[in-house]
From Swiss-Prot:
PROSITE patterns (alphabetical): CHAPERONINS_CPN10
Originating gene: groES
Cellular compartments per GO CC: cytoplasm
Molecular functions (GO terms): ATP binding; metal ion binding; protein folding chaperone; protein-folding chaperone binding; unfolded protein binding
Pfam families recorded: Cpn10 (PF00166)
Function: Together with the chaperonin GroEL, plays an essential role in assisting protein folding. The GroEL-GroES system forms a nano-cage that allows encapsulation of the non-native substrate proteins and provides a physical environment optimized to promote and accelerate protein folding. GroES binds to the apical surface of the GroEL ring, thereby capping the opening of the GroEL channel.
PANTHER family in alphabetical order: 10 KDA HEAT SHOCK PROTEIN, CO-CHAPERONIN GROES
Domain of life, source organism: Bacteria
Location in or out of the cell: Cytoplasm
Family statement: Belongs to the GroES chaperonin family.
Complex and partners: Heptamer of 7 subunits arranged in a ring. Interacts with the chaperonin GroEL.
CDD domains tied to this protein: cpn10
Organism: Stenotrophomonas maltophilia (strain K279a)
Keyword Cytoplasm included in the entry's annotation: yes
Protein name per UniProt: Co-chaperonin GroES
Amino acid sequence: MSIKPLHDRVVVKPIEADEISAGGIVIPDSAKEKSTKGEVVAVGPGKPLDNGNVRAPSLKVGDKVIYGQYAGSSYKSEGVEYKVLREDDVLAVIG
């Protein structure tokens, strides 16, 4: 993947939902919801502040995150879909 996010943006590779439910039912692709979990694969240099400084990003490559379902923009590279999000669109870091 050759994408470098700018400013306070991060690139997230969505983590696909399970193919089988907890009860053992196979979930067809048409019934799956869009993933809202993913792994950070690239991080921008940080958010430029009004005073000229740059606020360092709080996320790092490898973090597993939860983000809003409709947040960011989709980007496809080599058959893999990624989301480009603002750091503010990330709701939480998972364990």
